[in-house]
Amino acid sequence: YIGGNDSMDTIKKLSDYALLVGSDIKFMGVPKTIDNDLAVTDHTPGFGSAAKFIAATMKEIIRDGLVYDYPTVTIVEIMGRNAGWLTAASALARGEDCEGVDLIYLPEKVFDIDHFLERVKEIASKGRSMVIAVSEGIKVMDGRYVFELSDHVEFVDAFGHKQLAGSAKF
């Protein structure tokens, strides 16, 4: 089976169960995750194409903001509960034909709301549109996810993980 952390956990449970009941069925897991968060790897299958997609999408969003006669603020929330690789890939939008995103916030670093607002005001004072990339898993100093600071409804996925969404909404 090919999959991420939850899939590998399922493979382990199936393998353990097969041993328990004396079955000779063997289960094999091939790790793959776009989060790029598997230990002892340089990069994981799936990450490269996802990173390319993020960079291309961010470039399109940046260009979309250029059509307005007034400055806009666009916050894009990107997957990454505990790993900011995909959000960091938004920096790849920068090139000869694009200035890139203005701000990037990763889950590996505490999110400071006051500092964030200062940076937004600083960029806005220049009279231009901005695009901000935030990971779904950014947290404030007390450990709460940013999305928990707004009116949110808690959902869990099929594996029982709290679905993180709404950081950009906050």
Regions found by a protein language model. Give the residues of each.
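Accessory alpha-helical/coil subdomains and C-terminal extensions
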Residues: 1-3, 9-28, 44-170
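Glycine-rich, charge-decorated loop segments at or immediately adjacent to ligand/cofactor-binding or catalytic sites
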Residues: 35-43
